[in-house]
From Swiss-Prot:
InterPro entries in the record: DXP_reductoisomerase, DXP_reductoisomerase_C, DXP_reductoisomerase_N, DXPR_C, DXPR_C_sf, NAD(P)-bd_dom_sf
GO biological process terms held by the UniProt record: isopentenyl diphosphate biosynthetic process, methylerythritol 4-phosphate pathway involved in terpenoid biosynthetic process
Binding site for 1-deoxy-D-xylulose 5-phosphate: K125, S151, E152, S176, H199, S212, N217, K218, E221
Family of this protein: Belongs to the DXR family.
Gene3D superfamilies: 1.10.1740.10, NAD(P)-binding Rossmann-like Domain (3.40.50.720)
Protein name per UniProt: 1-deoxy-D-xylulose 5-phosphate reductoisomerase
Length: 385
């Protein structure tokens, strides 16, 4: 039996991880969980899975959960605040930590989990984006596996099984194209928040859905793939694949291409990561090739969707630039979600931040966090909110 901890248990990935655990309760035990403020869902998790440790960020939510556990006379330990995430990440008897919180807030808990010798089921792509070199070095030092949870990197990981990384000619990273595929920049000027949140294929959290609409999500995944698979950026190619059936491919030096195909259901890569290296019975219905539409692939429009180009540029520059990219994106997307800026302002804000700050190398976690805070402060001062 594997003991599981989940950072971000009430969000989209966390909820689907719980479904995987629920589906194979003899293989998994949930020991520790965290969430921000959804105390109702957390109480449901406590009732069903009986975790030993629960952390809530929001003080009101913490009090609600604590009162419930006291009322039911449960032995569950309930703690409050982001600092307590580290306790979930390094919980003594856990074997694997699912990092499904959004944003670079996941960096420190991920490093703590690695230092505690826990394998990482990584759904928090920002951790590798902002600190890929640091995280991969620490994982190697402590003998920890970093297992990709998102569909594209999970697909690449499966395509690499039984092969050697040195034989990779190219990673073909697929993208649905998002809700605005084919639109011009002028058309993007008029899109609404609801338009951007209407993803054609995937049901996800709000922030990642906007990232998918700008193609920044794919840009972040390019940087993540660079660190996960030790592949140069020149060998990572994005293909727009609107059917979202091929989740990614690997082309080898002999010209052969291995692809992973499946339904648009995140439980599939989650199940593979949690059970690795064992492949379990299916939890989702497989692709029906008789009813599958034709598969199409096209080049991404990086002139209209500049976020993807900015991500490539930041990744190839290295150093602190990916962290600047990420912080500016988090700030801009938050403003868009609050209806304070236009959709096209997102990439303009990111480009401004990348041009403003100089590169820095030899990064520590503190350097990354401090610079990210500087980016937010700079943008707030310039934009006014």
């Amino acid at each position: 039996m594997k003991n599981i901890s989940i950072l971000g248990a009430t969000g989209s990935i966390g909820t689907q991880t719980l479904d995987v655990i629920r589906n194979d309760s003899e293989a998994f035990k949930l020991l520790a969980v965290s969430a921000h403020s959804n105390f109702k869902k957390m109480i449901e998790i406590i009732d069903e899975f009986k975790p030993e440790l629960v952390v809530m960020v929001d003080k009101l939510a913490y009090n609600k959960v604590l009162d419930y556990c006291c009322e039911k006379k449960l032995k569950t330990s309930v703690k409050v605040g982001y600092e307590a995430f580290n306790e979930v990440a390094s919980y003594k008897d856990s074997n694997i930590v699912v990092t499904s919180i959004v944003g670079m807030i996941g960096l420190i808990p991920t490093l703590e989990a690695i230092k505690a010798g826990k394998d990482i089921a990584l759904a928090n792509k920002e951790t590798l984006v902002v600190a890929g070199e640091l995280v991969t070095k620490e994982a190697k030092k402590y003998g920890v596996n970093i297992l990709p949870v998102d569909s594209e990197h999970g697909a690449i990981f499966q395509c690499l099984q039984g092969n050697k990384y040195k034989d990779i000619n190219k990673i073909l990273l697929t993208a649905s194209g998002g809700p605005f595929r084919g639109k011009s920049f002028d058309e993007l000027n008029n899109v609404t928040l609801n338009d951007a949140l209407n993803h054609p294929k995937w049901t996800m959290g709000r922030k990642i859905t906007i990232d998918s609409a700008t193609l920044m999500n794919k840009g972040l995944e390019v940087i993540e793939a660079h660190w996960l698979f030790n592949v140069d950026y020149e060998k990572i190619q994005v293909l727009v694949h609107p059917q979202s059936i091929v989740h990614s491919m690997v082309q080898y030096k002999d010209g052969s291409v291995i692809a992973q195909l499946g339904p648009t259901d995140m439980r599939l890569p989650i199940q593979y990561a949690l059970n690795y290296p064992v492949r379990k019975e299916r939890i989702v219905e497989p692709v029906d090739f008789y009813s599958t539409p034709d598969l199409h692939f096209e080049k991404p429009d990086m002139d209209t969707f500049r976020c993807l180009r900015l991500a490539y540029d930041a990744g190839m520059a290295g150093g602190i630039m990916p962290a600047i990219l990420n912080s500016a994106n988090e700030y801009a997307v938050d403003l868009f979600l609050k209806d304070k800026i236009k959709f096209t302002n997102i990439q303009e804000i990111i480009e401004d931040a990348l041009n403003h700050f100089e590169n820095v190398n030899n990064l520590t976690a503190n350097t990354i966090i401090n610079k990210s805070n500087e980016v937010t402060k700079y943008l707030k001062g310039k934009i006014g909110f």
